[in-house]
Amino acid sequence: MSVPSSVIENHLVPKEIPVYRLNARESFNLLTEKEQLYAHHISVACWWGSKICLGQTSIESGPIFNLFQNLFSIQNLKSTVVPNIVSEEEYSDLLSYAATFYGNMGNYLSFGDSKFIPRISKEKLQLIINKVNDNKVNEYWGKCSELMYSLDKQVRELGIDGNGISTYYSPNITKVEIEKVQKFMDSKSISPYNTRLFKVSENNYNLLIASASTSTPTVSHQFDGYTINIVYGDWNKNLTKVVDNLKLALPYAANENQTNMLKKYIDSFYSGSIDDHKDSQRWWIKDISPAVETNIGFIESYRDPYGVRGEWEGFVSMVNKEMSLKFGKLTDNATTFLSKLPWDKSFEKEKFNKPDFTSLEVLTFATTGIPAGINLSNYDDIRQTEGFKNVSLGNVIAARKDEYVTFIQESDQKLFNELSTEAFELQVGIHELYGHGSGKLFTTDANGNVNFKVGEVINPLTNKPIDPKTEVYKFGETYDSVFKSLGSPMEECRAECCGIYLSPDEKILELFGFTDPKKAEDVYYVNWLIMARAGVCALEFYSPPSEGAPGKWRQAHMQARYCILTTFLRSGIVTLDKTADDVIVKLDKSKIRGIGVKAVGDFLNRLMVYKATANIDASIKLFDEYTHVNEEFLAIRDIVLAKKKPRKVFVQAHTYLNSNGKVCLQDFDDSTQGMIDSMITRFGKDDSDML
C-alpha cells in the first residue's frame, strides 16, 4: 500500500539540522588530573551503555549505527561519491539523517517518538554503498535498508497494542498481558526499570533483566494462569563494557561516597539488581556538590509506551559555581516557597531533605535526548524519605541563537529573544526543586500502616478525610506502577505548573538576581509566554485518530504543556488569534499575577491531590478533558506542522588518554559532519557489543 506524500514529508529528516556544540572545555580544564581521570572513565562507561538505547528504540537502529560507523570511517568518502555518484545536496541529506540518528541514538525522535527517514532516496544511498564496496558496509546495509525507509502504518510511531512498535515488548503482546505481568511484578516487588517483556507462547512470558552476568539461573513463576520466566543477561555485552570502565574509575573517586556509589553501580549492572542501583543513589545524594557530577543507569520511563521501563542514560558534568549559588539560595529558602504551593502542609513531606542543587556544564550525556534539568532519584521510596538531587544543565540551556519565533506577536519578538534563556533557567530551577521535589504520597507499609494521621488529613477536593483503604498506594505499588503511561505527562504537568505558579513571586525573582521590577516582570512574562507558545507547538506531538485508532500524545512534556495551555485559555489570560495560515499567542501580562496564578494554582492542587491519593481514575478523566484536541485545534495542528522546526542536536566532546596516561579533550565542529566525526572517533568500528 502506497504511503501518502503528506505522511512521507512529515517523516523525512529536514534539510537543515540545527547542530550545537556543548562547550565544556573551560570547565573541564579547571578539574584536577585525578578528577579528569574520574570523569573520563565514567564518560566512556556512559557512552558504551548508550548503545543499549539503539536496541531500546528499534530492531534496525543497531544495524543502522554500525552501517554509519563503517561507512563514514572510509577515507575520502565524500570525494569518492560526489559528484560522480550523488549530488552535493543528496550527500548533505545523508549527513543530516546520520546526524539526526546519532543525536537521537536511534531512528525515532527522542522527543515525540515518531520515526524519521532519510531525505536521500534509497536508490541513491544504494549507489553509494555499491561504490564503496566494503564488506561490513554491505553486511549492515543488508540488515537495515528495508526498515530504515519503511513507513508502514505500524512503524511510524512508538507504541503498543497495534498502535506503533516498541522493543521493550515482543510484537505479539497486548496491553492486557503487560498489565497482568505488572501485577505479578508488584506482588514480588520486582522493579520494571531494567526489564523488557517478551511473549514466548500462549500464557508464557520471558521477563528479561538487564545484567552483565549471564550465569543467574532462569526462575519460572506461576501467576494467575501465566508462566513468567525471569531471565537475566539482557544487554550483557553492553553492560560488561559499562562495568569494566566503571571499575577503571574507582581509583579516582574523590571520597567514600563516590567509591561506594561506583561499587553499587558495578554490582547493579553486573547482577541486574535494582536494589543495588537504589543503594548507588543513596550514596549519590550524599555526595554533595562534587567537582564532577554523574549518574548512570536505566532512568526515565518516558519512551516505554506502558510507562514503567527505563531508558539507558548516563551523564558526566562539571559544576558551574556562579549559577549554582543562585540554585543554592533557592534550596536554602525551600521551606518558605514550598509553603506557598496551593496545597495543605499535610500533602507535603514532614521533613524536606534539603537537596544538592547545582548548575552543571555537561561533558557527556549519553542517551537519546538531552534534558535541560534533572531531578533524581526516580525511586519514590528514596525521593520521599531520604532525599534527591536537582541539576540544571547550563550549557544545554544556553545553546540557542536569536531567531524569528513562531506563534508570538511581533511586539514580543525582541523581549523573547533577550530573556528566554534567563526565563528558562528560572523555570527549570523551580520545576526541578519545587516541582519534582515537592509533595507527599500517601502509602501503606507491609504491616498495613499508613504514613499519615487517619481522620485528620482532609482531601480538599471532597472535604472528607483521606480514606486509608482507597486513597493510598498499597504496599508494593509505586507512582509509576499505578499511573503507568499517564505518570510521566501528569508529573511533568505538575512540575511545570509549579514553575509558572511560583515564577511571578518577587522573592524568587530576587534570588535569581531580578531585583529591577521592570525586568522581573518581563522575565516572568516571557516564562509564561514560553509555556503558552509551547502548548501550541505541542500539537506537533499529537497523532489524530486514524482508521479506528484513538488519538495519541507522543511526548509527555508536550502533553503537559498543552494541558497548561488549556488552563490558560479557560482562565482568559491567553487568547489565540487565528488566520488561514498562522496562529498568534496573546498573553495578558496584567492578569498573570492575579487570574493566571489562581487558575494555575487551582489546577495544580488537583494534580497534587490525585497524585498523593493514587487516584488514577480521576487523573485519566482530567487529562482526557484538558488534552482533548477538537476540530478547531486539529486545524491549528496543520498550521503547526507546516511551520515546525527541527529540534537541535548536540555535538559532545570526546575524552581519551594520551601516551602519558593524561586525559585529553577533543572538540568537534557544530555541523552535521562534526556530529558524525564525534561518533566515529568515540566508537570506531567496534561492534563487539552488538547482539
Curated annotation (Swiss-Prot):
Q: How is the cofactor bound?
A: Binds 1 zinc ion per subunit.
- Protease as a keyword of this entry, yes or no, is yes
Catalytic residues, chain numbering: 432
Q: Which cofactor does it need?
A: Zn(2+)
Record InterPro entries? Dipeptidyl-peptase3, Peptidase_M49
Q: Under which name does UniProt file this protein?
A: Dipeptidyl peptidase 3
Subcellular locations according to the entry: Cytoplasm
**Source organism's superkingdom?**
Eukaryota
User: What Enzyme Commission number does this protein have?
Assistant: 3.4.14.4
What lineage, starting at the top, does this entry show? Eukaryota, Amoebozoa, Evosea, Eumycetozoa, Dictyostelia
Q: Which gene encodes it?
A: dpp3-1
Q: Name one GO biological process term.
A: proteolysis
Gene3D superfamilies from the xrefs? 3.30.540.30
Which controlled-vocabulary keywords does the entry list? Aminopeptidase, Cytoplasm, Hydrolase, Metal-binding, Metalloprotease, Protease, Zinc
Which GO MF term does the entry hold, naming one?
dipeptidyl-peptidase activity
Organism whose genome encodes this protein: Dictyostelium discoideum
Please give an example of a GO cellular component term from this record.
cytoplasm
